[in-house]
Amino acid sequence: MIQKNWQELIKPEKLQVNPGHDPKRFATVIAEPLERGFGMTLGNALRRILLSSLQGAAVTSIHIDGVLHEFSSIPGVREDVTDIILNVKDVAIRMQGDGPKRMVAKKTGPGVLLAGDIQTVGDVAILNPNLPICTLDEGAELRIEFTVDTGKGYVAADRNRPEDAPIGLIPIDSLYSPVRKVSYKVENTREGQILDYDKLTLQIETNGSITAEDALAYAARILQDQLEIFVNFEEPKRESETTAIQTLPFSPALLKKVDELELSVRSANCLKNDNIVYIGDLIQKSETEMLRTPNFGRKSLNEIKEVLASLGLHLGMEVPGWPPENIEELAKRFEEHY
């Protein structure tokens, strides 16, 4: 009976995801209903993980031709090096592989050096190419080399300085997290006649390297992984579910819908037009019956026979107890068993 501790708690069946004005960067996610107190517990934990623990990419150091340290000024460049560093920290980067990787930006004045002027390499992409880095006057020339790496959270500049750092290498603070802002609120919601359940609303903004919905999924997976060590027992399978499988007069695989068989469009449409919804419906048909279906030919027949054979099934089978009265409920219940 220990499983009642978690099985009888109410939980949301599906998340409601509302994209913002930029679906790649913004989303509002609503989870309801939750047991009283779980909204605050989950909201706070997910927010902390979103801001601190997701992998991302960032600039770790820069090297500017003719500059020895961050307190220098550059002839013909309106910003000093400290201002340039502040702007570089805001460059949003997506990098699929491992680092570090080096990129270069060159500019001749007059004009503004933008993040999009950085010459990317390999799988590196600049997500905010219109971000200004510095402004050059007439006749000024500038070359900056950027070192990019992957990591998580915030890393201070002193930790980004390699032991063999060359003269002129300027390490900078790195904010690897792809999540820029997270806020949440907990409100009352109802389930049936009970009014004191929690409704959790999360508002998430990313830098565009991942979607807000994916960021939340990764954060939830991290939390799940961290909690697994605290579970010191094997969860017994639900007795009712085991009994139901044993008493089912046919294989649960027959409850799978035929549109999940990855058939050709022609074959799938023929089955749909003949009101064949489940595999259990299909295997009871004979070859002759199938060939009577409009637009259904030998090619489609052979395709279906091949797919059924891969499942250990064939046309013309007898299925006792088919179709069950509650077929839709059974299909949903036994989905994980086929």
Swiss-Prot record:
Upper taxonomic lineage: Bacteria, Pseudomonadati, Pseudomonadota, Alphaproteobacteria, Hyphomicrobiales
Keywords of this entry: DNA-directed RNA polymerase, Nucleotidyltransferase, Transcription, Transferase
Region (Alpha N-terminal domain (alpha-NTD)): 1-234
Enzyme superclass (EC): transferase
Pfam families attached to this UniProt entry: RNA_pol_A_bac, RNA_pol_A_CTD, RNA_pol_L
Region of interest called Alpha C-terminal domain (alpha-CTD), as start-end residue ranges on this chain: 250-338
Catalytic activity: RNA(n) + a ribonucleoside 5'-triphosphate = RNA(n+1) + diphosphate
Subunit composition and interactions: Homodimer. The RNAP catalytic core consists of 2 alpha, 1 beta, 1 beta' and 1 omega subunit. When a sigma factor is associated with the core the holoenzyme is formed, which can initiate transcription.
UniProt family annotation: Belongs to the RNA polymerase alpha chain family.
Name of the protein in question: DNA-directed RNA polymerase subunit alpha
EC numbers: 2.7.7.6
HAMAP family, per database record: RNApol_bact_RpoA
GO biological process: DNA-templated transcription
Molecular function in Gene Ontology: DNA binding; DNA-directed RNA polymerase activity; protein dimerization activity
Free-text comment on this protein's domains from its UniProt entry: The N-terminal domain is essential for RNAP assembly and basal transcription, whereas the C-terminal domain is involved in interaction with transcriptional regulators and with upstream promoter elements.
